[in-house]
């Protein structure tokens, strides 16, 4: 009997960028800049984009702003690029409504985070995601587990019970461990496409069955992120490891404080005036900004 494992599909490609939300000088969403940035990210190697997720500051965006942002990005990149909308909420009715609206607005999928703050039990999580899946059966869903932010973690057995929902096709693993990927594959099989939610864990997660990454660093090093993933998948682990080790300083700098504070500063330093995060997040402090600038300079070709 061959020990070869079945590989998962890639419903949204290998490299997705979790987009920042640009704000203008008055703090309003800059839709024109969002469109230009989206196009740039695709040109730099992203297969698809996620709008209104954690990096996109969804907690401080109104539903109207999120809808406008999805429309602007969708128009900017055209029909050939998957665009996922963050539609999660800790209220099931709100998440259902947002997911239906995203489907109607032309999203190619929805990123749906586990409910935060109210800490539902596993049975509540199952009911929550089942209601969302049934409300928009034509829209592929990516479940999103990030317990460090939400206060609850979705167990692999719970995800496995949801595999009868045909539109639950993928999972963003952001618990900070490779064990989550293994446990999900053992519980759900190869049907579920697992994406790393941590830039620094992409390479080890690929080795245990993840199919790609929802990346923050790809705002700045999209081609290198893509090269790392492709090198590993094409049987060049040493090349992939070389990319990984070169990028570790950037990965650390981008998560030296709360995301997306550093990546917005990095984009500003790179000529993209995306503005500061909305309160209660703050701009990156001067010392960290100087260190980030040095990290970016070290990555530039000489």
UniProtKB/Swiss-Prot annotation:
InterPro entries, per the entry: Aldolase_TIM, DapA, DapA-like, Schiff_base-form_aldolases_AS, Schiff_base-form_aldolases_CS
Pathway listed: Amino-acid biosynthesis; L-lysine biosynthesis via DAP pathway; (S)-tetrahydrodipicolinate from L-aspartate: step 3/4
Gene3D superfamilies listed in its UniProt record: Aldolase class I (3.20.20.70)
Single annotated GO MF: 4-hydroxy-tetrahydrodipicolinate synthase activity
Residues marked Part of a proton relay during catalysis (site): 54, 117
Keyword annotations from UniProtKB, A to Z: Amino-acid biosynthesis, Cytoplasm, Diaminopimelate biosynthesis, Lyase, Lysine biosynthesis, Schiff base
Binding positions for pyruvate per the UniProt entry: 55, 214
Pfam families in alphabetical order: DHDPS
Enzyme Commission identifier(s): 4.3.3.7
Subunit-structure text: Homotetramer; dimer of dimers.
Stated name of the protein: 4-hydroxy-tetrahydrodipicolinate synthase
Lineage of the species this protein comes from: Bacteria, Bacillati, Cyanobacteriota, Cyanophyceae, Synechococcales
């Amino acid at each position: 009997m061959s020990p070869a494992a079945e590989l998962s599909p890639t419903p949204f490609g290998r490299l997705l960028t979790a987009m920042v939300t640009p704000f203008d000088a008055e703090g309003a969403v800059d839709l024109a800049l969002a469109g230009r940035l989206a196009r740039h990210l695709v040109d730099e190697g992203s297969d698809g984009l996620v709008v209104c997720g954690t990096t996109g500051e969804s907690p401080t965006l109104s539903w109207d702003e999120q809808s406008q942002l999805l429309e602007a990005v969708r128009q900017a990149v055209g029909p050939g690029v998957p665009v996922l909308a963050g539609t999660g909420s800790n209220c099931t009715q709100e998440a259902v409504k947002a997911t239906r609206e995203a489907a109607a607005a032309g999203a190619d999928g929805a990123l749906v985070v586990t409910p935060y703050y109210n800490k539902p039990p596993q049975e509540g999580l199952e009911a929550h995601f089942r209601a969302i899946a049934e409300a928009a059966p034509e829209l592929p869903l990516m479940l999103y587990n990030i317990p460090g932010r939400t206060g609850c973690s979705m167990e692999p057995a719970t995800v496995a019970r949801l595999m009868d929902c045909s539109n639950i096709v993928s999972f963003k693993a952001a618990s900070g461990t490779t064990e989550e990927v293994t446990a999900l594959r053992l519980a759900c099989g190869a049907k579920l496409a697992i994406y790393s939610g941590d830039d620094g864990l992409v390479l080890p997660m690929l080795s245990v069955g993840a199919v790609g990454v929802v990346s923050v660093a790809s705002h700045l090093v999209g081609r290198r992120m893509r090269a790392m993933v492709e090198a590993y998948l094409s049987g060049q682990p040493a090349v992939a490891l070389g990319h990984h080790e070169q990028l570790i300083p950037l990965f650390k700098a981008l998560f030296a404080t709360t995301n997306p504070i550093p990546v917005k500063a990095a984009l500003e330093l790179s000529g993209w005036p995306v503005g500061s995060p909305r309160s209660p997040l703050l701009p990156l402090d001067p010392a960290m900004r100087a260190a980030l600038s040095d990290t970016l300079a070290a990555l530039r070709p000489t």
